[in-house]
Amino acid sequence: MDIIITKDDLFNRVFEYQDMKLSEGLKIPLGHFVNQDYLEKMLVIDMAKDEIPHAFIGSTTGGGKSNFIRVMLLNWIMNKKVEDIELYLIDGKGGTDYVAFLEAPHVFMNKCFKDEDDIITILEDAHREILRRNQTFIQAKANNFKEYIELGNKMARRVIVFDEYAMYHGTSDYNVIQSKVSKICSTGRSAGVHIIIATQDARKEILDSMIKYNMPLKIGFKCDNAQHSKNISGHEGLETINKIGVGRAYGLPIDSDYVQFKTMKSPSSKEIRTMIHNKYKDYKKVEVVEEDVFFGEECED
């Protein structure tokens, strides 16, 4: 779905959304369409829709993957209430890209996890939570998360963001991690439990084909060559992208072809920390209610 905005309001003001709000569902402002009038349209995707509960993000080194994840996290943290989303952050490189987000009350334990034992615990707990929620839905006479919320109940969406997934390939726990990720991918949709996998290497021996199948939203940035592009998105073409920060999203439900878009640029870590601190320093005492805002800056050509 595309959002109509004005050039003067680009990225840094409240937008006219038609009937969409970033505070609802699990919406991600992907960026501008890369076409003759891309300054007029913003592409927003909603992972709360049944068709795209999980996502895969891939690129070469420096291709724009981590920048995109930062923009995604910032928009969720700044637009969604604390009680509406639980963020679990995992990064095989230790989480330096995401340190600025750890003060946000949405982030589980205010940590970004790297240790394999912690990762397995997070994934096991997510699967148990899926089973628990399904029992809760039965008791409430609801078929799924959406119906449960529509009945007036409260429940947070749980989102696991797992960056640098391929770094665990070859470790003693890799098969366990992959098995538990697969379970979440196949059962989490109806329970409001989502997982986003990001990696530079998406060969079939790294990322199981069944996991890929259950991640219909695929966002690919600059790749090294045609085979790298096919590993990430199932299509050639990502190797032709010339600019960092320009991504292609494949398999979006708006058509059967890919959509090329220009991503937003993440603010600096200092700016992110300031925004999060200013909004949530008193969140336990006073509920902060603000209009939705796209957070990010226009990438330079």
Give the label of every model feature segment.
Residues E287-V289:
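N-terminal, intrinsically disordered, polar/charged segments of Gram-positive cell-envelope systems
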Residues Q227-S229:
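Short acidic, Gly/Pro-enriched loop/turn segments at secondary-structure junctions
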Residues D2-I5, D9-Q139, R158-D224, S233, ...:
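P-loop NTPase catalytic phosphate-binding loop
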Residues I138-Y148:
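Short, glycine/acidic-rich hinge or "gate" loops at secondary-structure transitions
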Residues G245-D255:
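Small-molecule kinase domains that catalyze NTP-dependent phosphoryl transfer to phosphate-bearing small molecules
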Residues I149-R158:
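Short basic/glycine-enriched coil/helix segment immediately N-terminal to the Walker B
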